């Protein structure tokens, strides 16, 4: 009987400990959403809060490619589709609701230039061919843009292999971005840090 009582007490303590741990985990999950790829999700409000502390860098993959879709092309066959342009415009409106002040850059391809143009709805765009080359040198290129922008927030339209490289290099995760997916970085003391994946909303 005594042995049974001790086992019962131990089980109750174990269950109480387990329940407490689950409550803590649930609390953490409610405060920090995570993507299935292991990257933290950063919505517009979180991005705006981060931008108050440091210059942020948001790197978008371009919109839907015309040459890999049956949808209607916007114009040039090497550019984006009409649907892609409309998606970029809608995304830009949502983004600007939280981040109004930023400088805009893109690589030197038609699809990234069109994506950036529709995203920004007329904002001045600077084309930089270095945003096409994505290896270890990408960070120096981004820091150069930050200096040109006088450490303002910057938005860059680039390519999936760039985002994949950064996610793997900075956080060791596999990131296979869809059209208009984005990564969020911030600059601090001359260094770039990957904060997570941008999720509109």
From Swiss-Prot:
EC number: 3.1.3.-
Signal peptide stretch: 1-35
The protein's annotated pathway: Bacterial outer membrane biogenesis; lipopolysaccharide metabolism
UniProt KW Transcription regulation keyword: no
UniProt entry tagged with the keyword Kinase: no
GO biological process: lipopolysaccharide metabolic process
A Pfam family recorded for this sequence: His_Phos_1
Keywords: Hydrolase, Periplasm, Signal
EC top class, as a word: hydrolase
Molecular function in Gene Ontology: phosphatase activity
InterPro entries (alphabetical): His_Pase_superF_clade-1, His_PPase_superfam, LipoPS_heptP_Pase
Gene Ontology cellular component list: periplasmic space
Compartments, record wording: Periplasm
Reported function: Catalyzes the dephosphorylation of heptose(II) of the outer membrane lipopolysaccharide core.
Family: Belongs to the phosphoglycerate mutase family. Ais subfamily.
Family annotation (NCBIfam families): PRK15416.1
Name of the protein this chain belongs to: Lipopolysaccharide core heptose(II)-phosphate phosphatase
Native source organism of the sequence: Salmonella schwarzengrund (strain CVM19633)
Lineage, opening ranks: Bacteria, Pseudomonadati, Pseudomonadota, Gammaproteobacteria, Enterobacterales
């Amino acid at each position: 009987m005594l042995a049974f009582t001790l086992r019962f007490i131990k089980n109750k303590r174990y269950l109480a400990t387990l329940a407490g741990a689950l409550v803590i985990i649930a609390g953490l999950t409610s405060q920090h959403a995570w993507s299935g790829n292991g990257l933290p999700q950063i919505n517009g409000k979180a991005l705006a809060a981060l931008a108050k502390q440091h210059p942020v860098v948001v790197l978008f993959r371009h919109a839907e490619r015309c040459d890999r879709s049956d949808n209607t092309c916007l114009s040039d066959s090497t550019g984006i589709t009409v649907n892609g342009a409309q998606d970029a415009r809608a995304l830009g409106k949502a983004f600007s609701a939280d981040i109004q002040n930023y400088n805009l850059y893109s690589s030197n391809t038609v699809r990234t230039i069109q994506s950036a143009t529709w995203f920004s709805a007329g904002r001045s765009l600077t084309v930089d061919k270095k945003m096409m080359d994505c290896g270890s040198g990408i960070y120096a290129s981004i820091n150069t843009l930050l200096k040109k922008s006088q450490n303002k927030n910057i938005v860059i339209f680039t390519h999936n292999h760039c985002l994949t490289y950064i996610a793997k290099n900075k956080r060791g995760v596999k990131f296979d971005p869809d059209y208009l997916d984005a990564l969020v970085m911030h600059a601090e003391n001359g260094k770039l840090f990957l904060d997570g994946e941008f999720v509109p909303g």
